[in-house]
Curated annotation (Swiss-Prot):
This is Hemocyanin subunit X. Residues 1-20 form the signal peptide. PROSITE patterns: HEMOCYANIN_2 (PS00210), TYROSINASE_2 (PS00498). The keyword Metal-binding applies. It is found in: Secreted, Extracellular space. Glycans are attached at N329. Cu cation A binds at H210, H214, H243. Hemocyanins are copper-containing oxygen carriers occurring freely dissolved in the hemolymph of many mollusks and arthropods. The lineage of its organism: Eukaryota, Metazoa, Ecdysozoa, Arthropoda, Myriapoda. Cu cation B binds at H367, H371, H407.
Amino acid sequence: MKYCTESLILILAVIGCISAAINFKCPKGTAEEKHQKEIYDLVQRINRPLIPQFKEPNFPTSFLIKGKDPKEFFQAIGHLPKKEVFSLFDERHWDEAMTAYEYLYEAETLDDFIDIAKILYLHLNEDMFYYVFSFAVLYRKDTRNVRLPQVHDVYPDKFLKTDIINKIKQANYQGKQHPVIDATKEFHDLRNPVSYLHYFLEDIGMNSHHYHWHVMNSALRKAYPTEGEKKFYRKGELFYHMHHQMLNRYELERLSNGLPRCPTFENWDDPIAEGYASHLAVDRTGYRYTFRPDNLHVRDLPELTKDNMRVWRDRIFDAATSCSVLRENGSFVKICRTRFYGGLNILGNLIESNLRSINRMFYGNIHCYAHVIAARVTDPDGKYGQGNGVMYDVATSARDPLFYQWHKFLDHFFYEHLTKLPTNHLFHLQNPDVSITNLEIISNGRKNEIHTFWENDIMEISKGHSFTLNSDAKVKIQHLQHEKFEIHLTVQNDKGEDTDLFVRIFLLPLEDEESHELSLEEMVRMAVDIEKRVIPAKPGSNDIVISSRSIGAPANKFFGSFEERYISEDCNFHSHCGWPNYLLVPKGSSQGTPFAFVVMLTLAEDDFTPNMDDTCFCADSWSHCGSLFIQYPENVEMGFPFQPIIECTKEEFFALPNIAKQEVIIKFTGETKDSPLVIQLENDS
């Protein structure tokens, strides 16, 4: 346990800083040092096979006083074998995971919570345990000051390919201390054009974000009577918005690399044209994520046929286009009566098939089983005992190009629904009190040109994994990065008083892969939400500068050691959900790819919930991740002003005084630079 203890001293000091530095208005965590130590020690055991087991604690007295039966407890858990991968997409895992979560969430005290967690750890699949434990820590009020390692800290072998894991293991066998392994080399093949997108598809930060989004916005969360009801009021819409944004970022990377827009996988009798090999395995268990060759066909599963999914598809399409959703009691709810987001939320819950779906029996589980049926395409009935593909696991699914093809199919339901809503006319979009008189993007002294490049970074893997038995390891990885840029706005406030403005910043493509100009509809359907924030404006002219470094989750949230990652002056609470800052803009091309920054201003009093306590939501990326304990802070559609459909021409839209467009060139330099972590490592060696 020495390797846990050394790390623990530092992390407890950091957590103490966090607790002292913030005066929470949101629920303030009450975990003391002893609780934090026990929680951290418990998580450190996950995916580390040689840590000695602890004695199973007795059930808490409060558990027994409430009349809960330990026999029922043990009957409800332990069904998913220890060596399997837990899948949030596989409904067969839901009952066990949900039961475990409820035991944790409803524990009366922190001591009870920890005792129940220890019991669960000994009997639950470890993968499932990490998910439900993270979920409970996130939403219990008394654990608000507890930090857990991120999924790539706990399962680095779900993010690093087997050849890298084997090199780490070999270095450990040879007795090397603190080995540094180079994982910056990428394999590309002209026969597989998507291999040139692996820098995005297999990015550690992006895949970690996707996993933790599904923790923060879990499909398993029921409607609890207090904070849960507020928090999940717009969960279905957020499911659509975040995955729509992931799809759009992928589209921009395809355009940057001269590839056509992402195809839609909608005819399930057609072969899956693009294969995918992840080269991933969970080293401790030997579980390998199955390779999918090109042109395989989706086949029926023993528990689910394609015809079942077609029935669900047709029912959801009818609900989206008829504006009428069937409840379980046989009545209908209308979802197209107003411009606002209620219908998107109901539809999103239906499509994700989460526990807030109005009628899961009728509308089924199309999103989750799209993942499952795709993941089991090589061995659908288990005849050969093959593992599942990466689409099965939330931590790995966004690596597969099929993920985006499936989500583009699901995206179509939402688009059809949006076409049935009252459109956004010019009077919905304009605001007579504010205007933008100038917009410029400044990067390294250049106007309206942003350079991107490769950046080497360090992922640290702690001691105790099956491949780091004798020493921790550092892995040099490579990710996309951009030069720092600033968004310079000149804003005219004609309200006659100090005013808070709500600023929305988007990045839009201007041309397709063949350099043809895109229509307004095509542009806005691929719009990427860069930032939303409140800015103060005095009467008259205001010069406002927004730095790219203040947007999204910084690289040091993902890389370096877990302990050092949280030594910062900003002791804000982190849910681990947040789009990586280094992926803020697409790669662009060597000759330069044209895009447009679009900025819209409205009054914060109209569009943003006032008197918000920003410790309640993920300050890094609330637009993508939502909020903790409170309602989503934006008061209109999450995709506004591009949702619902805009009823005007391109010229009319960009001529609105409170909207500004600035064309920019994003140019990939081909350079490779070292991050501060790499520079520090080289200086220390």
